Amino acid sequence: MSKLVFNSIAVERRNNYKVIDLFAGCGGLDKAMASTWKYATIRVTKESSESLWKDNPCLSELSEVFLADWEVELYDIPRGEQFSVKADLNDLCRIGRFEMTQKIVRYFRGLGFPVCRDFIGRIEVWIPKDEGNAILYNRYTLRPYYKDITDGWQIDVSHSGESRCSKKTLYEVDLDDHGVEVIVGTEVLRRKQVKQHHFQKYGGGYPIVNKYTKKMLNLSEPRSYDRNKYATKMKKVNVFIQTYLVTPQFQDALDINILNNGALIEVKPSDILMVDDKAKNLKYGDGYVGAIPRNEFSEHGPFTQPQPFKYFFVSLDSPQSNATRNRLYNIFQNGRDTSIIRQGDIETGTNRTFKRLGEYLTQPLSWVPKLSLSYKSYDTALQELQQHLMDDSRFIPGTNYIAIIISEIHKDTQEPRLHELYYRMKELLMKSKITSQVIYAPNIDNNSFAYFLPNIAAAITGKQFGMPWGLESLSQRNDMIVGIGASKQQGRKPYLGTAFCFDKEGQFREFDCCQAEDTEALGTSLKKALWQFCKEYQKPDRLIIHYYKKLRREEGEQIEMMLKQNGQQCPVYVVNMVTAVNDDLIAFDASKSDFMPASGTYVHLRDTQFLLYNNERYSDYGKADILFPIKLTITSANTNTGGILTKEDTIDIITQVYQFCRLYWKSVKMQNVPITIAYPELVAEYVPHFNDEDLPEFGKHNLWML
């Protein structure tokens, strides 16, 4: 029997009534000071905390006061008049949360550890380990809550990652402001936040290693291959709790008692649920029904074949690239890679056999040698490709083509000119109605290249309008499902990608992309998609929007207005989802060695919020792929539902999300994000790099981004 626990511990206050220090606001702050004040304090208003004003007449002349939960950050910022007031921190639980935050920050900074806020406001404690020429920090997040998953107080604890820090100060290294963070005493600051007193006392602080600073600091970012990050996270959380929290010093500093000796809080059995077993089933071309594409796609073939296509190569004109192209041709067509060189009695090279690409696709391959392009240099590649594609005599009208781009450039290269080449080639090909598949040349030499081929075959199948695998039974009524994903890249405008009208087989109908702030363009696309859906399927039973963020009230009103303008009235549900890798609350299966709950498990967190698990464990003893859960928040976005989410709708929507997680075709490996979010995110990641910063029409109707 599974036993699920949260990464959270139960605590109780020794005394609910406390004396706390509050401050009146202070005017005349410049923009930077005002920003710091907002970061380091919480605002308490008379309207929201009437009992505080009633019990403390000294506040009667004020409408608001502030609690400084991040005190060091306010070093050189003036404060208003101070008031020591009595408060029931169970009754005023919001103030109680931040009073506990204040004391946690004080405690760990008192131990000399750097402490900062993470991007969603949690406390992040950095625990150091000396590595000789650098300091490695394990980062832990803490967040107090009241009456969340318990009837009292809790502290959620998570391991959020590792960071490496130089032992040289800003005085000793010449770094610009580009993405640089520094550890200054017990603060973690951006370079531009470092002030004069930081230089005087700490030499400006110690730079943190990132992809921009690692060369200048001659240090690498912390990278280690961990086969089970889920178990590692669980173990590190337990060690941190027992080492730093379940101590008299910590409990006295917060004036709390940690219950059950710091044991993790168990999930209530009534909050552990499972999708229907049929929702897990996938079907393939020969009729086989399974659940693990990594083991099944190669043997049973695509559920629906890709449309016939012809392919050609695009690669650098060099002896090495030409040899690589010939090897890849032989692997695709003949299932062989032979590069044996004999010198006397000594043989060197490779002699490997593979399953031919056409066997994966269950159709013959058609290579067109005269279409292949060998460009002279990276500097001329785009111009040569454009001229190559302008020769219409090379291409047969009505024929599907795939360009196999053999790239010597790693996708994560830090050379901007080379990095952009990858995206621009895809854009040029799409403008000529040609999709593409990029293969990183060094992978061909990898001893595991045989395991790359199923991924390539699955992606090509999807790009050519086939289905590598499908759902045996899609949990869907006549629903219109829209996915909206986002991409925000450093130095570029954020973009939204959208995927519209997934049908009952899980197929998409159309993609689009726009700048994140262009809500008018997004609304126009949504109207067009709704009109098209009604034309093909009549009125939708429900409009379900898978959204990368929580829906604002005004956005919900815009959606409802759009429905009225189209003459439609139907329930609208918005599902916000985030991958819970470093989230505040995750459930672990304490009865398993890898702590991973079974695939299809979903855990009720609070209100309409759930954790959903998709992996490859389907029994108590099966092996689980290490995929973190996604956190779902389901909300009603219109008045047709009266704001009520029924049990039936909840089960339907969660099951839909689970099944869309299982239709990711960029790889045969299972994924934890539904394609309704993952595919639009890919689109939004690519488009900002395109020359026109727009998605070509051809790219709106196929899975070119796989």
Predicted regions and their residues:
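A short, compositionally biased domain-edge/stem linker segment
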Residues: 2-11, 290-302, 465-470
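Short coil-to-helix leader/linker segments, especially the first N-terminal amphipathic alpha-helix
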Residues: 1-3, 282-292, 449-464
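S-adenosyl-L-methionine
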Residues: 1-54
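Extended, highly charged clamp/arch subdomains and adjacent linkers
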Residues: 150-441, 694-706
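Conserved beta-strand elements of the Class I
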Residues: 18-20, 310-314, 480-482
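Long, contiguous domain-sized segments
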Residues: 35-167, 172, 356, 362, ...
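Short, flexible hinge/linker loops that cap or flank conserved catalytic cores
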Residues: 13-14, 305, 474-475
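Conserved S-adenosyl-L-methionine
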Residues: 23-25, 315, 485
